[in-house]
Amino acid sequence: MDLWKKGKRFFRFSKEPVITCINTSYAGKEIIFDLIANPQMETKDVNLTLDFDAPIFHRKAGIDGLLTLTNKSKVNEIQLISIEVFIIGICKHKFHSSTVFLCLGTHIMEGQYIVPEELLDYAKKRGKNRIISIPNHSTVDIPFQVNFPKHVEVGPGRQIHSRVKVQYFAYANIIYQSADKLRSRRECQEINVLPSISPSSFLDSPSIMCVSKQPDLKKDRQRKSATRITVSLPRTDWLAGESVVSKIKIENHSKSSIKTLKLCLYRRIIGFDPPSWKTQQMMSHLNLSRKNSEVSKTCKCLQKETIRCNKKSNCYNWNGIAALETYTTECHIQIPDKEATITVGSNFEVDHFLKISVGNKLWTLNRVEIPFKIISANSLSLEQENVFLNLEKLTNKASPHGLPISVRLGNSLSYDALSAARRMRNTRYFLYS
Protein backbone atom coordinates (compact mmCIF):
# COMPACT_ATOMS: atom_id res chain seq x y z
CA MET A 1 0.00 0.00 0.00
CA ASP A 2 1.53 3.33 -1.12
CA LEU A 3 0.62 6.90 -0.23
CA TRP A 4 0.27 9.81 -2.61
CA LYS A 5 -0.18 13.41 -1.53
CA LYS A 6 -2.60 16.04 -2.77
CA GLY A 7 -2.33 19.36 -0.97
CA LYS A 8 -2.10 18.61 2.74
CA ARG A 9 -3.90 15.26 2.56
CA PHE A 10 -2.49 11.78 2.01
CA PHE A 11 -4.42 9.06 0.21
CA ARG A 12 -3.90 5.33 -0.05
CA PHE A 13 -2.81 3.91 -3.38
CA SER A 14 -2.95 0.14 -3.68
CA LYS A 15 -1.12 -1.62 -6.48
CA GLU A 16 -3.17 -4.77 -5.97
CA PRO A 17 -6.17 -4.77 -8.34
CA VAL A 18 -9.69 -4.68 -6.96
CA ILE A 19 -11.82 -7.53 -8.29
CA THR A 20 -15.47 -6.61 -8.79
CA CYS A 21 -16.49 -9.67 -10.82
CA ILE A 22 -19.68 -11.31 -9.60
CA ASN A 23 -19.42 -14.70 -7.85
CA THR A 24 -15.62 -14.78 -7.82
CA SER A 25 -14.28 -17.30 -5.30
CA TYR A 26 -11.03 -17.08 -3.40
CA ALA A 27 -9.37 -19.54 -5.80
CA GLY A 28 -10.64 -17.51 -8.75
CA LYS A 29 -9.11 -14.33 -7.32
CA GLU A 30 -5.76 -16.06 -6.90
CA ILE A 31 -5.89 -17.12 -10.56
CA ILE A 32 -6.67 -13.55 -11.64
CA PHE A 33 -3.78 -12.16 -9.59
CA ASP A 34 -1.44 -14.73 -11.15
CA LEU A 35 -2.61 -13.94 -14.69
CA ILE A 36 -2.09 -10.20 -14.23
CA ALA A 37 1.30 -10.63 -12.55
CA ASN A 38 2.57 -13.20 -15.10
CA PRO A 39 0.82 -12.62 -18.45
CA GLN A 40 3.35 -14.74 -20.36
CA MET A 41 5.23 -17.88 -19.35
CA GLU A 42 7.55 -19.36 -21.93
CA THR A 43 9.16 -22.80 -22.22
CA LYS A 44 11.75 -24.17 -24.61
CA ASP A 45 9.85 -27.19 -25.87
CA VAL A 46 6.33 -25.77 -26.49
CA ASN A 47 5.21 -22.84 -28.62
CA LEU A 48 1.73 -21.38 -28.12
CA THR A 49 -0.08 -18.75 -30.21
CA LEU A 50 -3.53 -17.13 -30.05
CA ASP A 51 -5.38 -16.09 -33.21
CA PHE A 52 -8.77 -14.41 -33.50
CA ASP A 53 -11.09 -14.06 -36.48
CA ALA A 54 -11.95 -10.40 -35.73
CA PRO A 55 -10.35 -7.46 -33.88
CA ILE A 56 -13.65 -6.56 -32.16
CA PHE A 57 -16.00 -8.90 -30.29
CA HIS A 58 -19.56 -8.23 -29.15
CA ARG A 59 -21.26 -9.56 -26.08
CA LYS A 60 -24.01 -11.44 -27.94
CA ALA A 61 -21.67 -13.16 -30.41
CA GLY A 62 -19.03 -14.21 -27.89
CA ILE A 63 -15.34 -14.69 -28.63
CA ASP A 64 -14.13 -17.19 -31.24
CA GLY A 65 -10.43 -17.95 -31.45
CA LEU A 66 -7.84 -20.50 -32.50
CA LEU A 67 -5.17 -21.94 -30.23
CA THR A 68 -2.07 -23.27 -32.02
CA LEU A 69 0.17 -25.60 -30.02
CA THR A 70 3.56 -26.75 -31.35
CA ASN A 71 5.88 -29.30 -29.77
CA LYS A 72 9.39 -28.05 -30.58
CA SER A 73 11.17 -30.80 -28.67
CA LYS A 74 13.44 -32.97 -30.81
CA VAL A 75 13.16 -36.08 -28.63
CA ASN A 76 10.39 -35.98 -26.04
CA GLU A 77 6.65 -36.17 -26.43
CA ILE A 78 4.49 -33.91 -24.29
CA GLN A 79 1.50 -35.11 -22.32
CA LEU A 80 -1.27 -32.52 -22.09
CA ILE A 81 -2.96 -32.20 -18.72
CA SER A 82 -5.16 -29.09 -19.04
CA ILE A 83 -5.84 -26.21 -21.44
CA GLU A 84 -7.69 -23.11 -20.20
CA VAL A 85 -8.67 -19.80 -21.77
CA PHE A 86 -9.43 -16.68 -19.70
CA ILE A 87 -10.89 -13.29 -20.69
CA ILE A 88 -9.98 -10.43 -18.33
CA GLY A 89 -11.19 -6.82 -18.45
CA ILE A 90 -9.10 -4.26 -16.51
CA CYS A 91 -9.82 -0.59 -15.85
CA LYS A 92 -6.77 1.38 -14.73
CA HIS A 93 -6.34 4.86 -13.29
CA LYS A 94 -3.10 6.77 -12.93
CA PHE A 95 -3.51 7.47 -9.19
CA HIS A 96 -5.82 4.65 -8.10
CA SER A 97 -5.75 0.88 -7.99
CA SER A 98 -6.85 -0.95 -11.12
CA THR A 99 -10.22 -2.70 -11.26
CA VAL A 100 -10.87 -6.16 -12.72
CA PHE A 101 -14.51 -5.89 -13.80
CA LEU A 102 -14.64 -8.81 -16.27
CA CYS A 103 -13.27 -12.30 -15.67
CA LEU A 104 -14.41 -15.33 -17.65
CA GLY A 105 -12.75 -18.71 -18.05
CA THR A 106 -13.39 -21.92 -19.93
CA HIS A 107 -11.75 -25.36 -19.92
CA ILE A 108 -10.81 -26.50 -23.40
CA MET A 109 -9.24 -29.67 -22.05
CA GLU A 110 -9.21 -31.20 -18.58
CA GLY A 111 -7.41 -34.55 -18.30
CA GLN A 112 -9.40 -37.35 -19.89
CA TYR A 113 -12.77 -35.85 -19.03
CA ILE A 114 -12.87 -32.83 -21.36
CA VAL A 115 -11.12 -33.50 -24.67
CA PRO A 116 -11.79 -31.55 -27.89
CA GLU A 117 -12.21 -33.41 -31.16
CA GLU A 118 -8.93 -32.07 -32.53
CA LEU A 119 -7.01 -33.96 -29.80
CA LEU A 120 -8.78 -37.32 -30.07
CA ASP A 121 -6.25 -38.56 -32.64
CA TYR A 122 -3.48 -38.07 -30.08
CA ALA A 123 -5.19 -40.09 -27.33
CA LYS A 124 -3.29 -43.08 -25.99
CA LYS A 125 -4.28 -45.66 -23.41
CA ARG A 126 -2.06 -45.96 -20.36
CA GLY A 127 -3.38 -48.50 -17.90
CA LYS A 128 -6.99 -47.64 -17.09
CA ASN A 129 -6.64 -44.03 -18.15
CA ARG A 130 -6.22 -42.28 -21.46
CA ILE A 131 -3.64 -39.58 -22.05
CA ILE A 132 -3.22 -36.95 -24.75
CA SER A 133 0.31 -37.19 -26.08
CA ILE A 134 1.65 -34.78 -28.72
CA PRO A 135 4.69 -36.15 -30.59
CA ASN A 136 7.74 -34.03 -31.28
CA HIS A 137 7.70 -31.59 -34.22
CA SER A 138 3.87 -31.65 -34.28
CA THR A 139 1.41 -28.76 -34.49
CA VAL A 140 -2.21 -28.87 -33.32
CA ASP A 141 -4.89 -26.23 -34.01
CA ILE A 142 -7.63 -26.09 -31.37
CA PRO A 143 -10.61 -23.75 -31.90
CA PHE A 144 -12.41 -22.39 -28.85
CA GLN A 145 -15.34 -20.15 -27.96
CA VAL A 146 -16.07 -18.04 -24.89
CA ASN A 147 -19.66 -16.89 -24.33
CA PHE A 148 -20.77 -14.06 -22.07
CA PRO A 149 -23.52 -14.67 -19.49
CA LYS A 150 -26.42 -12.24 -19.44
CA HIS A 151 -25.56 -10.76 -16.05
CA VAL A 152 -21.91 -9.99 -16.90
CA GLU A 153 -20.90 -6.34 -17.38
CA VAL A 154 -18.49 -6.16 -20.33
CA GLY A 155 -17.65 -2.46 -19.95
CA PRO A 156 -17.46 0.32 -22.55
CA GLY A 157 -14.83 -1.24 -24.83
CA ARG A 158 -11.15 -0.46 -25.15
CA GLN A 159 -10.34 3.10 -24.09
CA ILE A 160 -6.89 4.68 -23.81
CA HIS A 161 -6.51 8.12 -22.22
CA SER A 162 -3.71 9.84 -20.38
CA ARG A 163 -5.19 8.99 -16.96
CA VAL A 164 -7.61 6.13 -17.61
CA LYS A 165 -7.23 2.88 -19.54
CA VAL A 166 -9.78 0.14 -20.21
CA GLN A 167 -8.18 -2.96 -21.70
CA TYR A 168 -9.21 -6.54 -22.43
CA PHE A 169 -6.83 -9.50 -22.47
CA ALA A 170 -7.18 -13.10 -23.58
CA TYR A 171 -4.99 -15.63 -21.76
CA ALA A 172 -4.27 -19.20 -22.84
CA ASN A 173 -2.73 -21.43 -20.17
CA ILE A 174 -1.43 -24.97 -20.80
CA ILE A 175 -0.16 -27.44 -18.22
CA TYR A 176 1.74 -30.40 -19.63
CA GLN A 177 4.24 -33.05 -18.65
CA SER A 178 7.58 -33.44 -20.39
CA ALA A 179 10.40 -35.74 -19.29
CA ASP A 180 8.60 -36.48 -15.98
CA LYS A 181 8.34 -32.76 -15.17
CA LEU A 182 5.24 -30.61 -14.99
CA ARG A 183 5.53 -27.38 -16.94
CA SER A 184 3.26 -24.45 -17.67
CA ARG A 185 3.05 -22.36 -20.83
CA ARG A 186 1.02 -19.16 -21.02
CA GLU A 187 0.27 -16.69 -23.79
CA CYS A 188 -1.51 -13.33 -23.59
CA GLN A 189 -3.01 -11.12 -26.29
CA GLU A 190 -4.99 -7.89 -26.13
CA ILE A 191 -8.47 -7.86 -27.67
CA ASN A 192 -11.46 -5.53 -27.69
CA VAL A 193 -14.87 -6.45 -26.28
CA LEU A 194 -17.91 -4.23 -26.81
CA PRO A 195 -21.44 -4.36 -25.41
CA SER A 196 -24.26 -5.16 -27.84
CA ILE A 197 -26.95 -2.49 -28.00
CA SER A 198 -30.08 -2.80 -30.11
CA PRO A 199 -31.18 0.27 -32.09
CA SER A 200 -34.63 0.22 -30.48
CA SER A 201 -33.30 0.48 -26.92
CA PHE A 202 -30.75 3.08 -28.02
CA LEU A 203 -33.39 5.32 -29.60
CA ASP A 204 -35.78 4.89 -26.68
CA SER A 205 -33.38 6.37 -24.12
CA PRO A 206 -35.18 9.09 -22.14
CA SER A 207 -34.81 12.77 -22.89
CA ILE A 208 -33.18 15.14 -20.42
CA MET A 209 -33.56 18.84 -19.63
CA CYS A 210 -31.51 21.19 -17.43
CA VAL A 211 -32.33 24.74 -16.36
CA SER A 212 -29.86 27.28 -15.07
CA LYS A 213 -30.26 28.97 -11.71
CA GLN A 214 -33.34 31.15 -11.46
CA PRO A 215 -32.14 34.77 -11.54
CA ASP A 216 -33.23 37.34 -8.99
CA LEU A 217 -34.69 39.92 -11.35
CA LYS A 218 -34.73 42.73 -8.78
CA LYS A 219 -31.03 42.40 -7.92
CA ASP A 220 -29.55 41.03 -11.16
CA ARG A 221 -31.32 43.28 -13.65
CA GLN A 222 -28.96 46.13 -12.85
CA ARG A 223 -25.95 43.76 -12.80
CA LYS A 224 -26.62 42.66 -16.39
CA SER A 225 -26.74 38.97 -15.34
CA ALA A 226 -30.48 38.29 -15.28
CA THR A 227 -30.46 35.52 -17.88
CA ARG A 228 -31.93 32.05 -17.82
CA ILE A 229 -30.86 29.08 -19.99
CA THR A 230 -32.93 25.96 -20.63
CA VAL A 231 -31.19 23.11 -22.46
CA SER A 232 -32.83 19.85 -23.52
CA LEU A 233 -31.42 16.77 -25.22
CA PRO A 234 -33.72 14.35 -27.09
CA ARG A 235 -32.00 11.35 -25.47
CA THR A 236 -29.34 10.57 -22.89
CA ASP A 237 -27.39 7.98 -24.93
CA TRP A 238 -25.25 9.10 -27.87
CA LEU A 239 -22.80 7.34 -30.15
CA ALA A 240 -19.16 8.30 -30.49
CA GLY A 241 -18.76 10.23 -33.75
CA GLU A 242 -22.35 11.47 -33.67
CA SER A 243 -23.52 15.08 -33.48
CA VAL A 244 -25.27 15.97 -30.22
CA VAL A 245 -28.45 17.91 -30.94
CA SER A 246 -29.33 20.34 -28.17
CA LYS A 247 -32.34 22.62 -28.03
CA ILE A 248 -31.41 25.85 -26.23
CA LYS A 249 -33.83 28.46 -24.90
CA ILE A 250 -32.31 31.73 -23.66
CA GLU A 251 -34.36 34.25 -21.67
CA ASN A 252 -32.66 37.62 -21.47
CA HIS A 253 -34.16 39.61 -18.59
CA SER A 254 -31.29 42.08 -18.42
CA LYS A 255 -30.93 45.47 -20.07
CA SER A 256 -27.91 44.42 -22.15
CA SER A 257 -27.80 42.27 -25.28
CA ILE A 258 -26.26 38.80 -25.55
CA LYS A 259 -23.79 38.42 -28.39
CA THR A 260 -21.94 35.14 -27.70
CA LEU A 261 -23.12 31.54 -27.33
CA LYS A 262 -20.57 28.85 -26.43
CA LEU A 263 -20.94 25.06 -26.54
CA CYS A 264 -18.22 22.94 -24.93
CA LEU A 265 -18.07 19.14 -24.69
CA TYR A 266 -16.14 18.03 -21.59
CA ARG A 267 -14.73 14.75 -20.34
CA ARG A 268 -14.65 14.61 -16.54
CA ILE A 269 -12.64 12.10 -14.49
CA ILE A 270 -13.82 11.82 -10.88
CA GLY A 271 -11.55 10.13 -8.34
CA PHE A 272 -12.70 8.76 -4.99
CA ASP A 273 -10.84 8.22 -1.76
CA PRO A 274 -10.21 4.46 -1.73
CA PRO A 275 -11.72 2.94 1.44
CA SER A 276 -10.61 -0.23 3.13
CA TRP A 277 -10.47 -3.40 1.07
CA LYS A 278 -13.66 -4.95 2.51
CA THR A 279 -15.65 -1.73 2.18
CA GLN A 280 -14.36 -1.31 -1.35
CA GLN A 281 -15.58 -4.77 -2.34
CA MET A 282 -18.98 -4.14 -0.73
CA MET A 283 -19.40 -0.80 -2.51
CA SER A 284 -18.51 -2.31 -5.87
CA HIS A 285 -21.05 -5.13 -5.50
CA LEU A 286 -23.89 -3.01 -4.09
CA ASN A 287 -23.27 -0.01 -6.38
CA LEU A 288 -23.37 2.38 -3.42
CA SER A 289 -23.06 6.11 -3.86
CA ARG A 290 -19.51 7.46 -3.65
CA LYS A 291 -20.18 11.20 -3.89
CA ASN A 292 -19.20 11.75 -0.26
CA SER A 293 -15.70 10.38 -0.96
CA GLU A 294 -14.85 12.49 -4.03
CA VAL A 295 -11.26 13.74 -3.81
CA SER A 296 -10.38 14.88 -7.32
CA LYS A 297 -12.01 16.11 -10.50
CA THR A 298 -10.24 16.74 -13.78
CA CYS A 299 -12.05 18.11 -16.82
CA LYS A 300 -10.83 18.34 -20.39
CA CYS A 301 -12.60 20.15 -23.21
CA LEU A 302 -12.94 17.78 -26.19
CA GLN A 303 -14.91 19.98 -28.57
CA LYS A 304 -15.71 23.67 -28.53
CA GLU A 305 -17.96 25.80 -30.69
CA THR A 306 -18.40 29.54 -30.29
CA ILE A 307 -21.24 31.37 -32.04
CA ARG A 308 -20.89 35.14 -32.34
CA CYS A 309 -23.39 37.46 -33.93
CA ASN A 310 -20.74 39.48 -35.78
CA LYS A 311 -18.80 36.50 -37.10
CA LYS A 312 -18.87 35.98 -40.86
CA SER A 313 -18.91 32.15 -40.65
CA ASN A 314 -22.04 32.10 -38.50
CA CYS A 315 -23.85 29.02 -39.85
CA TYR A 316 -26.80 29.52 -37.49
CA ASN A 317 -27.54 33.07 -38.73
CA TRP A 318 -27.60 34.14 -35.11
CA ASN A 319 -27.83 37.88 -34.55
CA GLY A 320 -27.68 37.81 -30.77
CA ILE A 321 -30.43 38.43 -28.25
CA ALA A 322 -31.61 41.93 -27.50
CA ALA A 323 -32.57 43.11 -24.03
CA LEU A 324 -35.75 41.67 -22.52
CA GLU A 325 -36.17 39.07 -25.30
CA THR A 326 -36.36 35.28 -25.49
CA TYR A 327 -34.64 33.21 -28.18
CA THR A 328 -34.79 29.48 -28.99
CA THR A 329 -32.31 27.67 -31.24
CA GLU A 330 -31.01 24.18 -32.01
CA CYS A 331 -27.24 23.65 -31.94
CA HIS A 332 -24.98 20.74 -32.81
CA ILE A 333 -21.58 19.64 -31.58
CA GLN A 334 -19.55 16.65 -32.76
CA ILE A 335 -18.45 13.83 -30.42
CA PRO A 336 -14.93 12.43 -31.02
CA ASP A 337 -14.88 8.93 -32.50
CA LYS A 338 -13.01 7.17 -29.68
CA GLU A 339 -14.90 8.57 -26.68
CA ALA A 340 -16.96 6.49 -24.25
CA THR A 341 -18.39 6.90 -20.76
CA ILE A 342 -16.61 4.64 -18.23
CA THR A 343 -18.40 3.49 -15.07
CA VAL A 344 -16.60 0.20 -14.30
CA GLY A 345 -13.81 1.68 -12.16
CA SER A 346 -14.05 1.00 -8.43
CA ASN A 347 -12.27 4.21 -7.36
CA PHE A 348 -13.01 6.46 -10.32
CA GLU A 349 -15.42 7.07 -13.18
CA VAL A 350 -15.38 8.98 -16.46
CA ASP A 351 -18.45 10.91 -17.55
CA HIS A 352 -19.26 13.55 -20.16
CA PHE A 353 -21.32 16.71 -20.07
CA LEU A 354 -22.22 19.58 -22.35
CA LYS A 355 -21.62 23.10 -21.06
CA ILE A 356 -23.58 25.98 -22.60
CA SER A 357 -22.74 29.55 -21.68
CA VAL A 358 -23.99 32.92 -22.92
CA GLY A 359 -22.51 36.37 -22.58
CA ASN A 360 -20.36 38.97 -24.30
CA LYS A 361 -16.71 39.25 -25.22
CA LEU A 362 -15.62 40.32 -21.75
CA TRP A 363 -17.78 38.25 -19.39
CA THR A 364 -20.12 35.29 -19.13
CA LEU A 365 -23.64 36.04 -17.99
CA ASN A 366 -24.85 32.51 -17.24
CA ARG A 367 -24.03 28.86 -17.88
CA VAL A 368 -25.57 25.41 -17.54
CA GLU A 369 -24.19 21.85 -17.64
CA ILE A 370 -26.15 18.86 -18.92
CA PRO A 371 -24.75 15.31 -18.56
CA PHE A 372 -25.16 12.50 -21.08
CA LYS A 373 -23.70 9.08 -21.88
CA ILE A 374 -21.41 8.25 -24.81
CA ILE A 375 -21.43 4.71 -26.27
CA SER A 376 -18.96 3.30 -28.76
CA ALA A 377 -20.40 3.32 -32.29
CA ASN A 378 -19.27 -0.28 -32.81
CA SER A 379 -21.58 -1.38 -29.97
CA LEU A 380 -24.69 -0.62 -32.02
CA SER A 381 -26.05 -3.71 -33.76
CA LEU A 382 -26.76 -2.92 -37.41
CA GLU A 383 -28.80 -6.07 -37.98
CA GLN A 384 -31.97 -4.00 -37.53
CA GLU A 385 -31.06 -1.03 -39.71
CA ASN A 386 -34.69 -0.76 -40.84
CA VAL A 387 -35.39 0.83 -37.43
CA PHE A 388 -33.34 3.81 -38.62
CA LEU A 389 -34.32 3.66 -42.28
CA ASN A 390 -38.07 3.59 -41.67
CA LEU A 391 -37.82 6.62 -39.42
CA GLU A 392 -35.59 8.46 -41.89
CA LYS A 393 -38.35 8.20 -44.51
CA LEU A 394 -40.53 10.43 -42.35
CA THR A 395 -38.50 13.47 -43.36
CA ASN A 396 -37.24 14.54 -46.77
CA LYS A 397 -36.51 18.15 -45.86
CA ALA A 398 -32.93 19.30 -45.92
CA SER A 399 -31.65 20.74 -42.68
CA PRO A 400 -30.85 24.48 -42.85
CA HIS A 401 -27.27 25.67 -42.96
CA GLY A 402 -25.97 22.20 -43.82
CA LEU A 403 -26.69 20.81 -40.34
CA PRO A 404 -27.80 17.23 -39.57
CA ILE A 405 -31.52 16.51 -39.86
CA SER A 406 -33.44 16.15 -36.62
CA VAL A 407 -36.70 14.22 -36.63
CA ARG A 408 -39.38 14.46 -34.00
CA LEU A 409 -41.26 11.24 -33.37
CA GLY A 410 -42.25 11.02 -29.73
CA ASN A 411 -38.77 12.11 -28.70
CA SER A 412 -36.60 14.30 -30.90
CA LEU A 413 -33.98 12.06 -32.50
CA SER A 414 -30.83 12.68 -34.50
CA TYR A 415 -30.31 9.99 -37.13
CA ASP A 416 -26.68 10.85 -37.65
CA ALA A 417 -26.19 7.79 -35.40
CA LEU A 418 -26.60 5.38 -38.32
CA SER A 419 -23.95 7.09 -40.42
CA ALA A 420 -21.59 7.21 -37.42
CA ALA A 421 -22.02 3.49 -36.79
CA ARG A 422 -21.49 2.67 -40.47
CA ARG A 423 -18.38 4.82 -40.64
CA MET A 424 -16.86 3.11 -37.61
CA ARG A 425 -17.66 -0.32 -39.04
CA ASN A 426 -16.05 0.50 -42.40
CA THR A 427 -12.96 2.07 -40.85
CA ARG A 428 -10.03 -0.21 -40.23
CA TYR A 429 -9.65 -0.67 -36.48
CA PHE A 430 -6.21 -0.58 -34.88
CA LEU A 431 -5.88 -2.03 -31.39
CA TYR A 432 -2.53 -0.42 -30.72
CA SER A 433 -3.15 3.05 -32.13
Swiss-Prot record:
Domain of life assignment: Eukaryota
SMART domains: Arrestin_C
GO terms under biological process: ubiquitin-dependent endocytosis
InterPro entries: Arrestin-like_C, Arrestin_C-like, Arrestin_domain-protein, Ig_E-set
GO annotation, cellular component aspect: cytoplasm; cytosol; plasma membrane
GO molecular function: calcium ion binding; protein-macromolecule adaptor activity; ubiquitin protein ligase binding
Family: Belongs to the arrestin family.
Protein name (database record): Uncharacterized protein C557.05
